Each structure stands twice: as structure tokens, then as C-alpha cells.
């Protein structure tokens, strides 16, 4: 059978919060079967746990934020994208601050951490959510859709009228049965416009943002000396974000997601619309891994 997965070992990292600019201590820990991904604010007394579920999303302005009462965890999407890409079902994410560290602005460092900790299969069936019919949400000219698909596919289109984007690929469609999340998506960094960063900083946001953890674009060009990691890094980062946002369903998806100018808010609206329409999806497991439309990298020993 396709089994649930957790981490083999505990692993720690330190980074800065994108918005606070302050140091954050991150610890990833194994968790029992059926726990899911749980964010844990260990700087609070008592400690507060917030499960990574669509219904716990409270803010979506600049990132996806989980909220429980007056406690929050910002910027969960890149870490969740890494968890989804490596098929991690159960883990505790301990944080010393209200924000996941931004690292280099991609999911790459989180993939490295998880692979360094090692993957541990557990004695329980992995559950998938299979899309049975189309579910769509729209807002102005933005659109997000789930469609049936025998596998996991993410298609995205961005539309920026800006010199850096003109003539550059603004669409991408990735079928993960034939494309590696780790190689082709995980290293795509978040991006921002210099004018927006200046505005955000004046409101005490993006205080930790820099060319070390984002692609920064001015009126005419990319300011990062090393340029882009992928020719289509901008749209691939939107795919990375979407994968993280979709993992708030609590299970891996069998289906296709299509986004046109979608962001964290619309992605979350789509999840909630899907969960409300119980005839649009079903939970499935696979006793025979060969019959499954999705496969994951084999667990590797911790190094």
C-alpha cells in the first residue's frame, strides 16, 4: 500500500521572518499517524498548536496565515509546498515566532531540511482527495479551478504588464507524474517590485525582504545579480505557492488545479468551496502502490 509518511529525525534551522525581519528558530519533528501537519508556537505559554487546515486560514494578504484565536503563524505556504512535494503527511513544525522563516524565498531549503531529516513510512494508508467534478471560484478577472485528472497537475497563468515580464513565459503547466517537484519547482523564489517593497516597509511589512530571499524587480529589470534560477521562475513560484496552499486540504490531491492570476485568497476560497461540495470529491487509498496515479520519491536514509 501507499503509506503515510513522517520525518525520520528531528531537524532544526534558523532564519528571518519576511515581514518582521526578526530571527526565527524552526524545528521539524516526526508526528504519529493521522496527525497531519501541525504548526506549534513554542514561544507562547501555554504552547499553541494550529493544524494546517483550510478552515484555519485567517489572513491571505501577503501570504497564507493560519490563525487560532489571537495567535497566528504567517507565511506557511513554502514549507507546506515542500511537505506536499515530498509526500509528508504528519509532522510538527515548532516556531519561536509568529512567522515561518523565509529562508531563500523558495521551498528549496525546506526540501533540503526534510531530506536531511529522512523520510519514515508509517503503518497506515496514505489518504488522497480525488476531484470528481469541476469546482471553480472567480473574483474580478481572477479564477481558480479544480478539475478531475488521473494524477496531480498544476497549471498557472500570470499577467503582468511590465518590461521584465513582456516576452517572458507567463504560463506553465506541470504534470507531477512526469516532472520532479524538487528539480523543477522547489527552487523558484518569491518575487516583488521595488516600489511595493518600499511601500510595505513604510507599514512595517517585508522588513526581512531582500535580494537574498526574493527576486526583486525595479521599473525595468531584475535586480538580483545572479538573475533567475529558471527562465519561467515567476510563474513557477506561483505554482509552488499553489501547491502549498492546496496542501491545506490535509491530504495530497488527485486532480488538476488551474489558476489565472490567482493568489492566496482565491486559492483558499477554492479549497473551502470544494470542501462544502461533498459530491465533488472523495477520499481514496491505494493498497497497491502500482495502481496509484501518483508516486513519491522513495524514503532515503538520513545523512
Swiss-Prot record:
A cellular component annotation (GO) from this entry: membrane
Family under the similarity heading: Belongs to the LpxC family.
Active site: 264 (proton donor)
Classification via PANTHER family: UDP-3-O-ACYL-N-ACETYLGLUCOSAMINE DEACETYLASE 1, MITOCHONDRIAL-RELATED (PTHR33694:SF1)
Reactions catalysed according to its record: a UDP-3-O-[(3R)-3-hydroxyacyl]-N-acetyl-alpha-D-glucosamine + H2O = a UDP-3-O-[(3R)-3-hydroxyacyl]-alpha-D-glucosamine + acetate
Broad enzyme group: hydrolase
The keyword Metal-binding is annotated on this UniProt entry: yes
This protein's UniProt keywords: Hydrolase, Lipid A biosynthesis, Lipid biosynthesis, Lipid metabolism, Metal-binding, Zinc
SUPFAM superfamilies hit by this protein: Ribosomal protein S5 domain 2-like (SSF54211)
Binding site for Zn(2+): 78, 237, 241
EC number: 3.5.1.108
Protein name: UDP-3-O-acyl-N-acetylglucosamine deacetylase
Protein purpose: Catalyzes the hydrolysis of UDP-3-O-myristoyl-N-acetylglucosamine to form UDP-3-O-myristoylglucosamine and acetate, the committed step in lipid A biosynthesis.
Statement: the UniProt record of this protein carries the keyword Lipid biosynthesis: yes
InterPro entries linked to this entry: Ribosomal_Su5_D2-typ_SF (IPR020568), UDP-acyl_GlcNac_deAcase (IPR004463), UDP-acyl_GlcNac_deAcase_C (IPR011334), UDP-acyl_N-AcGlcN_deAcase_N (IPR015870)
Organism: Azotobacter vinelandii (strain DJ / ATCC BAA-1303)
GO molecular function terms noted in the UniProt entry: metal ion binding; UDP-3-O-acyl-N-acetylglucosamine deacetylase activity
Required cofactor names: Zn(2+)
GO BP, one annotated term: lipid A biosynthetic process
Pathway field: Glycolipid biosynthesis; lipid IV(A) biosynthesis; lipid IV(A) from (3R)-3-hydroxytetradecanoyl-[acyl-carrier-protein] and UDP-N-acetyl-alpha-D-glucosamine: step 2/6
Amino acid at each position: 500500500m501507499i503509506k503515510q509518511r513522517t520525518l525520520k529525525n528531528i531537524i532544526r534551522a534558523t532564519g528571518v521572518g519576511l515581514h518582521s525581519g526578526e530571527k526565527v528558530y524552526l524545528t521539524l519533528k516526526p508526528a504519529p499517524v493521522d496527525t497531519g501537519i501541525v504548526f506549534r508556537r513554542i514561544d507562547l505559554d501555554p504552547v499553541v498548536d494550529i493544524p494546517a487546515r483550510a478552515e484555519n486560514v485567517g489572513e491571505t494578504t501577503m501570504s497564507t496565515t493560519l490563525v487560532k484565536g489571537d495567535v497566528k503563524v504567517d507565511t506557511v505556504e513554502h514549507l507546506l509546498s515542500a511537505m506536499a512535494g515530498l509526500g509528508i503527511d504528519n509532522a510538527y513544525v515548532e516556531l519561536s515566532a509568529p512567522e515561518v522563516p523565509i529562508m531563500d524565498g523558495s521551498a528549496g531549503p525546506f526540501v533540503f531540511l526534510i531530506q536531511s531529516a529522512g523520510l519514515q513510512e508509517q503503518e497506515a494508508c496514505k489518504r488522497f482527495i480525488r476531484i470528481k467534478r469541476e469546482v471553480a471560484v472567480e473574483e474580478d478577472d481572477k479564477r481558480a479551478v479544480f478539475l478531475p485528472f488521473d494524477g496531480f497537475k498544476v497549471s498557472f497563468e500570470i499577467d503582468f504588464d511590465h518590461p521584465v515580464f513582456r516576452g517572458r513565459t507567463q504560463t506553465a503547466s506541470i504534470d507531477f507524474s512526469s516532472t520532479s517537484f524538487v528539480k523543477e519547482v522547489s527552487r523558484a523564489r518569491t518575487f516583488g517590485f521595488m516600489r511595493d517593497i518600499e511601500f510595505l516597509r513604510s507599514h512595517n511589512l517585508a522588513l526581512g525582504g531582500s535580494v537574498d530571499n526574493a527576486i526583486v524587480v525595479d521599473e525595468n529589470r531584475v535586480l538580483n545579480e545572479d538573475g533567475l534560477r529558471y527562465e519561467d521562475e515567476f510563474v513557477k513560484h506561483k505554482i509552488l505557492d499553489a501547491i502549498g496552499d492546496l496542501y491545506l486540504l490535509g491530504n495530497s490531491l488527485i486532480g488538476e488545479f488551474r489558476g489565472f492570476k490567482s493568489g492566496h485568497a482565491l486559492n483558499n476560497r477554492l479549497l473551502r468551496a470544494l470542501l462544502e461540495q461533498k459530491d465533488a470529491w472523495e477520499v481514496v487509498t491505494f493498497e497497491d502502490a502500482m495502481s496509484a496515479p501518483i508516486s513519491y520519491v522513495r524514503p532515503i536514509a538520513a545523512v
